[in-house]
UniProtKB/Swiss-Prot annotation:
One of its GO terms (cellular component) is cytosolic large ribosomal subunit. GO terms for biological process: translation. Belongs to the universal ribosomal protein uL14 family. It comes from Streptococcus uberis (strain ATCC BAA-854 / 0140J). The keyword Ribonucleoprotein applies. Part of the 50S ribosomal subunit. Forms a cluster with proteins L3 and L19. In the 70S ribosome, L14 and L19 interact and together make contacts with the 16S rRNA in bridges B5 and B8. GO terms for molecular function: large ribosomal subunit rRNA binding; structural constituent of ribosome. SUPFAM superfamilies: Ribosomal protein L14. Keywords: Ribonucleoprotein, Ribosomal protein, RNA-binding, rRNA-binding. This is Large ribosomal subunit protein uL14. Binds to 23S rRNA. Forms part of two intersubunit bridges in the 70S ribosome.
Length: 122
């Protein structure tokens, strides 16, 4: 579960390395985000020459969480880190590569471009 002030790794090559959650989108009093949910975040660490700079406010979608997600068949999927991919308003990633695995729930949430760029879908 990702909440306000949570720091996440960035799993793409948009130029950001780490982001800090500002707000979870989707409802007035929503506190937590899971895999496939969109957040508003601030870039805390960035690589030189990247598309996004430190201090930029961006939208990102959660692709991996330590808490994990429960599948309809009763199984759970958990990851070693909390990670997100920076996206544009039309749900396409700002980077051209995705690093690390992403959850199958991304396909159901409608992020086909992220799923197709990912090296592994679990």
């Amino acid at each position: 579960m990702i909440q306000q002030e949570t720091r996440l790794k960035v799993a793409d090559n948009s130029g950001a390395r780490e982001i800090l959650t500002i707000k979870v989108l989707g409802g007035s009093g929503r506190k937590f985000a899971n895999i496939g949910d969109v957040i508003v975040a601030s870039v805390k660490q960035a690589t030189p020459g990247g598309a996004v700079k430190k201090g930029d406010v961006v939208k990102a979608v959660i692709v991996r969480t330590k808490t994990g997600a429960r599948r309809p068949d009763g199984s759970y999927i958990k990851f070693d880190d909390n990670a997100a991919v920076i996206i544009r308003d039309d749900k396409t990633p700002r980077g051209t590569r995705i690093f690390g695995p992403v959850a199958r729930e991304m396909r159901e949430a409608g992020y086909m471009k992220i799923v197709s760029l990912a090296p592994e879908v679990l």
